[in-house]
């Protein structure tokens, strides 16, 4: 079974959810994009590379747009006022077992879990204090 499937990127209680769907898979880079116009789309990319004889490296990127419109010649056009970029690299030794990798995923989920220090600092647009 493929894991290159659509998923909910932003869970906002149902109505404001942002779903991203597979859009491209070239040169080993999987890309998911939301259904918004390209200029306003959320985008996720993920690639897996052999970074050394002993390690496999995952590179994950997420683009979050600030959705806005711009009037050009009397026509409102969709634009992104700005974008926020997340870049994450994860290196896993090639001899890690599946259960080791499941534990790594649990650590990633805990890192970004609602209410924990890092997402709280980001959501409040502040630092760690």
Swiss-Prot record:
Molecular-function GO term, any one: structural molecule activity
GO biological process terms, semicolon-separated: regulation of translation
Assigned GO CC terms: T=3 icosahedral viral capsid
Disulfide bond annotation, renumbered to this chain: none
Compartments in which it is found: Virion
Subunit structure: Homodimer. The capsid proteins form dimers that assemble by group of 5. Twelve such pentamers are linked together with free dimers. The homodimers binds to the viral RNA via an operator hairpin, but also to many other RNA sequences in the viral genome; this interaction probably shifts the virus from the replicative to the assembly phase and ensures specific encapsidation of the viral genome.
Role according to the record: Capsid protein self-assembles to form an icosahedral capsid with a T=3 symmetry, about 26 nm in diameter, and consisting of 89 capsid proteins dimers (178 capsid proteins). Involved in viral genome encapsidation through the interaction between a capsid protein dimer and the multiple packaging signals present in the RNA genome. The capsid also contains 1 copy of the A2 maturation protein.
Location of region: Viral RNA-binding: 31-104
Keywords: Capsid protein, Repressor, RNA-binding, T=3 icosahedral capsid protein, Translation regulation, Virion
Name of protein: Capsid protein
Domain of life: Viruses
Effect in UniProt of substituting residue 85 to S: Binds, but does not photocross-link to RNA
Family: Belongs to the Leviviricetes capsid protein family.
């Amino acid at each position: 079974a493929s894991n290159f499937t659509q998923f909910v990127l932003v869970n906002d209680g149902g109505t404001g959810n942002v779903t991203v769907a597979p859009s491209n898979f070239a040169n080993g880079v999987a890309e998911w994009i939301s259904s918004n116009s390209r200029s306003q789309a959320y985008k996720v990319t993920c690639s897996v590379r052999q970074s050394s004889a002993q390690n496999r490296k995952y590179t994950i990127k997420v683009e979050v747009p600030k959705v806005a419109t711009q009037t050009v010649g009397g026509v409102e056009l969709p634009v992104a006022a700005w974008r926020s970029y997340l870049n994450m690299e994860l290196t896993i030794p090639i001899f890690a077992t599946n259960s080791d990798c499941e534990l790594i995923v649990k650590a990633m989920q805990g890192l970004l879990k609602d209410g924990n220090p890092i997402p709280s600092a980001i959501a409040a647009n502040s630092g760690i204090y």
